Amino acid sequence: MTSPHFAWLPPEINSALMFAGPGSGPLIAAATAWGELAEELLASIASLGSVTSELTSGAWLGPSAAAMMAVATQYLAWLSTAAAQAEQAAAQAMAIATAFEAALAATVQPAVVAANRGLMQLLAATNWFGQNAPALMDVEAAYEQMWALDVAAMAGYHFDASAAVAQLAPWQQVLRNLGIDIGKNGQINLGFGNTGSGNIGNNNIGNNNIGSGNTGTGNIGSGNTGSGNLGLGNLGDGNIGFGNTGSGNIGFGITGDHQMGFGGFNSGSGNIGFGNSGTGNVGLFNSGSGNIGIGNSGSLNSGIGTSGTINAGLGSAGSLNTSFWNAGMQNAALGSAAGSEAALVSSAGYATGGMSTAALSSGILASALGSTGGLQHGLANVLNSGLTNTPVAAPASAPVGGLDSGNPNPGSGSAAAGSGANPGLRSPGTSYPSFVNSGSNDSGLRNTAVREPSTPGSGIPKSNFYPSPDRESAYASPRIGQPVGSE
């Protein structure tokens, strides 16, 4: 430096800095190490020279021997240069250590400087009448001399150290041109630009990589980042292929873990196929876990468009269903919507047949509980809408009919409820033996609640707007009578 800062520092600081440091011990140790390295390099030169000399004569003579000799000669030249540089470094380190020892000897002891300052304070404190003025001047002159001695010692040390460092030449990089790195960026790398240990190739960062531009451990290929990848441009661990992101993938451009196929087709983990999302799916457009087929969602389904758990078939929802479009549990039919059904389009439980919507139904279009037959929506009915109606083989006390709506009606068209049996068609009363009855104790067709009179119209209420005689004559006369007002 052109203007060392120590020139402006008092002797208290310069002396303290020189005596507080580690001294010349590290410099002497460095000089010794460089000297030993130079000796080892010279020994290597002699050993390698004796071995390679046989490449130009004897059985090794030939093109391969000539090529090997060219490389060996280059290596020997580098070793010679390195040995010379090591010897120079050892000498310069020892020169700097010697300069430090000389500067330290010329530096004033910190204790002497401290004593001078202490005496100055004492004389100044007791100089009541000016009697200590000469002594104060002597002490101050001694302090200034100490300042000058420290600055001179530091200046000499700075000059000698700068001269020693200037004689050191930068080290050559011939060894790296051989493609072998030993003990610089790692342990042993083969190639160029590798950082780590056991790398073979170029510009690898990490350990035991083979290829170029790998980052991590145990990668084979180029541009891999992670561990144990085989291929190009993989990001993660244990990938095989190209451009995979994740772990354990086999294929191209896959994102996720433990997948096989081509990138952009699946998402999730462990999926095989196209458009799958979730875990462990096989097929097309599945979501969930462990599905096999097309468009399944849920868990452990197989088929097409199933949802729920452990379904097999087409469009089923629920659990443990087989066949098509089932909803519920344990259905094995087509379009069942409840549980344990074996039917066609059933929506209840334990139904067999077709299009049953109740429980324990069997037949076609049954909608009640425990019904058998067809077109029923009652309980155990055939074409009936009541409870406990039977379609055929009714007992003697209960005549058989159809379209009954009562309870218990074995006939037809009964709408009443009670203990009696209606054998007619659509009898809304009680104990009617006829057809479409609505009254009591009548038999026939369309009976009313009370018996009708023999004279037609006698049962119609009168409004007194027409007098009775005129009304009767009007019926007997062929012409239309005139109304007559009442008095």
From Swiss-Prot:
Where found?
Secreted
Provide ranges: composition bias, Low complexity. Answer: 398-424
* Gene Ontology cellular component list: extracellular region
> In the UniProt record, does the keyword Secreted occur?
yes
Instruction: Enumerate composition-biased segments (Polar residues).
Output: 428-446
Query: What top-level branch of life does the organism fall under?
Result: Bacteria
> Keyword Ribosomal protein, does the record have it?
no
Q: Which cysteines are joined by disulfide bonds?
A: none
InterPro entries hit by this protein = Mycobac_pentapep, PPE_dom, PPE_sf
Q: Where is this region: Disordered?
A: 398-487
Q: Name one GO biological process term.
A: symbiont-mediated evasion of host immune response
Q: Report the transmembrane regions from the record.
A: none
Give the family per the record: Belongs to the mycobacterial PPE family.
> PANTHER family, from UniProt?
GLUTAMINE-RICH PROTEIN 2
The entry's function note states: Plays a major role in the integrity and stability of the capsule.
**Which named protein is this?**
PPE family protein PPE10
